[in-house]
C-alpha cells in the first residue's frame, strides 16, 4: 500500500494507483481579509490555525496551502483608480527578498512544521494578471480595465504583467526551494471581456503565466493548473493546453467539459475535479449515498489512472468536512 505522498505523486504522474486520491480545500479567512494579510499578524494567524485544524480533522491525501491574506501584490506603482496604463511604463519588480514574498515563505514553513503526516503540499498562486486586476479593481472583476489597458497600450500592459510575473516566479521558486512546498497551484482565468481575444491573451497575458509555471517547474515543483470559474467566470480551456503543468483542474459543469474530455484536450495529463464547489452543489447539499454514488460515477467515466477527485474550485468554509471522507471512502472501494 502506497503512502499518501506516494499515492498522490503517482496519480499526478498518471501512474497506476491503489485508490483514486481525493483533494478538497477551503479558505480559512473571510473574503474581506484576503487582500489584507500582508504585515497583519491576526489574519495570518487565523490562516495558520485554520490549516492546522483542517489537517487534523480531515487528514487529507494532499493539501493546497491557502495564501489567504496575500492576495494584494504590494507594488507601489499600482493603485486603485488607475486609468492609464502608460502611468506604469516605469514599473519595477519588488524583488525576491521583498517582505511580501518572505512572509509567504515563512507561512508555508510554519504550516508544514505542523503537519501530522508526510503529504504533498501545493501552494496557492494567482496569475500575474489576476493580482493586477485586484489592485486596480476588485477581487471579482476588473476584466474591463484589462481590456481598456490593452486598447490603450498593449506593449506597456505586457511589460506590467511580465514585471509582476518576475515577482510571482520568485515567490514560487522560494516557496518550493526554501519552504519545502512540492509545487504551486496556479490559478488562471480567461479575461471576461470580448475585446481580449485568444490571440491577445496568448501575446500579452500568457507569457507572464508561462514564466511562473516554468520557474516553478525548474525549481522542482510538481504543479497544478487551475482554470478558475469563480463567481461564474467562463473560460476557454484550450487557451491553456501548452501550459507546463502535469495536473489540470477546471469547472466541469459550467464549462460543459467532463474530466474524461478534458484529459483528451490536455494530451492525457492528470485531471483534478468532478464536483461542483458551491453551496448548491451535491457535495454541500447531498446525502452520503448520493455523494458516494457521484464519486463512483466520476471514476467509472474517467478511469482510475490520471485522476484526482476534487471540486471545480474552493469549497465553502462552513462545509461539514465529513463529506470529504464520504468521497474518499467511495473512491477507495
Over which residues does each language-model region extend?
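N-terminal accessory beta-strand-rich subdomains and adjacent acidic, glycine-rich linkers
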Residues: 44, 50-54
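Active-site loop segments of alpha/beta catalytic cores
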Residues: 1-29, 36-37, 50, 61, ...
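Alpha/beta catalytic barrel-like cores
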Residues: 25-32, 52, 61-95, 99
